[in-house]
Amino acid sequence: MKKSKHLKRPYLKRSHLKHSDKASSFKGLLKKEDNVISLENFKPKESEDLLENFSNKKDMQELLGLLNQFILQSYKVEKEFKDYKALYEWVIEILPQAIWVVNENGSFFYKNSLANQSHEVFNKAKLENFNTEIEHENKSYLVQQNSIQGKQIITATDISAQKRQERLASMGKISAHLAHEIRNPVGSISLLASVLLKHANEKTKPIVVELQKALWRVERIIKATLLFSKGIQANRTKQSLKTLESDLKEALNCYTYSKDIDFLFNFSDEEGFFDFDLMGIVLQNFLYNAIDAIEALEESEQGQVKIEAFIQNEFIVFTIIDNGKEVENKSALFEPFETTKLKGNGLGLALSLQVVKAHEGSIALLENQEKTFEIKILNAS
């Protein structure tokens, strides 16, 4: 903040003055306020004339002592002022808000560093006369304004995270409700499709198989939605990694794709502690994403997906490698309901991250020549 150009000089208590005739003349130049004496009325010319009248050495020493005390107090007050100013500026800087202090003529009296980075937010809010919510660069801001001592104090708070949580909570409730409503009719259709398959001839059988695959996909989305809305809790049991590989190969037969893709599975013969059903969902999500990434390529290149699983120290490690389309928006990779795929719902990776965290693990997109996802979960009972 700007320093005031007219700071009052520090005051001296009256008790500091000695009572002598000539010193009392000097007191006449001082201003008395609430039993405190200041030098506001001290004029250089008058002080020179007064000093010439001090013939007594003792009086001169009294005056010099008084001035010395005043100087020391001035230094002390100046230091305190600078310390308080630095403290206030530090507090304002660490606040998670952009802060502008505006003069009556519209010029800026003060701005913190966040305000310096938020000119467009200020300009948009100004058009709305402040005290509003605005959207800027995919973020939401709450702008508030107040007036004090002829100045406007305007703050802009980033409420994007709060808005996102509200949106996710609302979408989660709606999705869970829809999943429950859809589940029963889908179950009935699935049962009828099974009956239809038994009576289908060679010509209609492939159609019924594709119908079953589509129904299986719907059921999988319903299951993922319900899991996401309820929260994840891992029930770890001792399982073979090879069994997980077999389950993944079976799930692959239920997924529809058009390109020629090689699938390379390399799961070790070891056993580990994990939730078999939940980790099966996670690996299916990454396997299907790899297939979709290969399908998204315009070139008719031979697709390849490699999936490995092994135990490394206290972790079970899974790697999924594919030569499909690169990840476009890495920052939103695990955001719920965020997807760039036409047939995606944006819950696959978000749910996968929840499952992995429930296993005290992590997911990383490695910066290799090939697109590689690495999943690590704690191997603990």
UniProtKB/Swiss-Prot annotation:
Reported function: Member of the two-component regulatory system FlgR/FlgS that induces the transcriptional induction of the genes needed in motility and flagellar biogenesis. Also plays an essential role in bacterial survival at pH 2.5 independently of FlgR. Functions as a sensor protein kinase which is autophosphorylated at a histidine residue and transfers its phosphate group to the conserved aspartic acid residue in the regulatory domain of FlgR. In turn, FlgR functions as a transcriptional regulator initiating transcription from RpoN-dependent promoters.
Species this chain originates from: Helicobacter pylori (strain ATCC 700392 / 26695) (Campylobacter pylori)
Lineage: Bacteria, Pseudomonadati, Campylobacterota, Epsilonproteobacteria, Campylobacterales
Annotated Histidine kinase domain residues: 177-381
Keyword Transmembrane helix: no
EC top class, as a word: transferase
EC number: 2.7.13.3
Consequence of gene disruption: Shows a pronounced survival defect at pH 2.5 not due to the nonmotile phenotype.
Superkingdom, taxonomy of origin: Bacteria
Keywords: ATP-binding, Kinase, Nucleotide-binding, Phosphoprotein, Transferase, Two-component regulatory system
UniProt modification remark: Autophosphorylated.
A Pfam short name: HATPase_c
Protein name: Sensor histidine kinase FlgS
Catalytic activity: ATP + protein L-histidine = ADP + protein N-phospho-L-histidine
Residue numbers carrying Phosphohistidine: H180
Any GO molecular function: phosphorelay sensor kinase activity
The keyword Kinase is annotated on this UniProt entry: yes
Binding partners and assembly: Interacts (via its C-terminal kinase domain) with FlhA (via N-terminus).
